[in-house]
Amino acid sequence: MDHIGVVVDDLAAAIEFFVALGLEAQDRQLVEGESVDRMMSLGGARFERAFVRTPDGHGWLELVEFHSPPYTGERSLEPSNAPGIRYVTFVVDDLDAVLSDIREHGAELVGEVQNYENIDKLCFIRGPAGIIVELAERLG
């Protein structure tokens, strides 16, 4: 796997959110052109993107904010059990500290923080554009 693409409505806020989780922001880039239109099957596609990567350099997210064409469909916040790509997980050293910091960037808990069999301390939060992010603190 190379990276995961996440479409957001506010690229700057999404970058801040993932940087607060410990990822490293890379350069932003404006993308447009006929090849993009044809690949995405969108007319007049124009978007700005930025990659954020895990500190070890092995995991990448491509954050994308479309300028055109505008999205006109309905937006829903799917529950954790809906089919499809549902969440991305990050291992953190101190879940409580990360939660405290990330709430300043608009994150909200989906459920409750849980101790899973004394192996992991886990929670789901909603991040930019309603995506679910799982935070995991290894306990053992």
Annotate each language-model stretch with its function:
Residues 1-9, 50-67, 74-101, 121-126, ...:
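Vicinal oxygen chelate
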Residues 7-58, 97, 104, 123-126:
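Core segments of cupin and vicinal oxygen chelate
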Residues 33-39, 71-74, 116:
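A cross-kingdom feature marking solvent-exposed beta-strand/loop segments within repeated
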Residues 42-44, 114-117:
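Short loop/turn motifs at secondary-structure junctions and domain boundaries
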Residues 68, 117, 139-140:
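A short acidic/small-residue loop/turn micro-motif
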Residues 107-114:
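Short, basic/aromatic recognition patches
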Residues 135-137:
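Conserved SAM-binding loop
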